[in-house]
């Protein structure tokens, strides 16, 4: 071998060789297969090209590591829950504390609820552990960024679908949160996305007032051109999925037949300004709408008449949504007066639009327990959603990009109910987005929250693991001298609760370094009328 051919390079090639080791004469035995790995060492020559220069490593590159993609796999939690149910073990959520050794005991959010959706434990700390999205997971960005107007999880929870100002649908993986697909769905911004209760259809409404019908494969099968004169703000399906309602900035609500959608079946008139939100109750014959005229109206979809109007809001009502689980008799409303209100439909006086334009129900006075006010927001509330498995948990997003989680069963500040008091958040994520949080949606199992904002980002949040120092602190995770405050764990012996508890330090992330508002430690008390 000539010397100018270059240095010798050794290459090791593994080759799999399959050999039958023997046969068994028993009729039910098959031949066993033994696999051997044979390593062959080969030598080859390699001539470097003329002018070859070794790559210079940039300064500081040796410290770089491959990017780690976070994955949220809830299979282990469901597996443990299934085994516990088969073995007849009882769940004791009061034993869940902020210490890393309790990670193995973490169960799915639905494991901590009763049949009616209420928490099995009266310990508010369990709500924080099981249902509070306090851990940042991943940010999802399109190659060409546009404000995110709407987001919804697919019914199976495997993917997330977002709609942007450019009219694009973007499909994200629900476990690794990476990009999967993108398509041009509308010619203008996608303002609303809604899956049917059966999961077989998807409706989308855009900024120009058009409605499109989609199959789960995102195949468009029907279009209603100019369903409204102005932007469609929200859509909602009837419990049977045979009808749906749309709300628009033209001040009208329209009820459509899903199979005969050429013309609106009925038009609901009564709002004096833009309709910002609409929802159809999953059991009752009720439609709720919120408007820029500072009013909330309840409608009878059969007669297309207004059956009640709620006065007393100080600004635009941006979001109205019925309770999806539990008793399903609560109504949540987010307003641009920096508050949210929880209304109990069972304790409200009836009113009728036929009595005059001002007929309706005023906001309850102090001491009236038909309403609870959720306070503590740093700016106007633009988005609101209920937790899918915990009937007493509500999450809201504000204009400044913060996300708040409330437990409506806690005692209002001041110990009284009414518009002058308020329930404070159990967890706050300051500056979750750089600007307004335009949409919020929980995973069907409730362990992951998606938020979309006008900062052109989609972010994913999960409940923190016990003792996770990087999660955002709440009043139940607030570190004390010996770890978690014992008085936030009612029913747990002080001596045993202090044993083995590590001090939880709060580690700020690069994007979220705003100080969290101080929250008082109030003992949880169920609100009469909110009982499930």
From Swiss-Prot:
One annotated GO biological process: co-transcriptional mRNA 3'-end processing, cleavage and polyadenylation pathway
SMART domains: WD40
A GO CC term assigned to this protein in UniProt: mRNA cleavage and polyadenylation specificity factor complex
Biased composition (Basic and acidic residues): 61-72
General function of this protein: Required for 3'-end cleavage and polyadenylation of pre-mRNAs. Also involved in chromosome segregation where it has a role in chromosome attachment to the mitotic spindle.
InterPro entries the UniProt entry points to: G-protein_beta_WD-40_rep, Pfs2-like, WD40/YVTN_repeat-like_dom_sf, WD40_repeat_dom_sf, WD40_rpt
Disordered as annotated region, ranges: 50-72, 513-532
PANTHER family: PRE-MRNA 3' END PROCESSING PROTEIN WDR33, WD40 REPEAT PROTEIN
Positions of WD repeats: 143-182, 185-224, 227-266, 270-309, 312-353, 376-416, 432-471
Main location: nucleus
Pfam assignment, any one: WD40
Organism of provenance: Yarrowia lipolytica (strain CLIB 122 / E 150) (Yeast)
UniProt-annotated location(s): Nucleus
Record key words, sorted: Chromosome partition, mRNA processing, Nucleus, Repeat, WD repeat
Name of this chain's protein: Polyadenylation factor subunit 2
Gene: PFS2
Domain of life assignment: Eukaryota
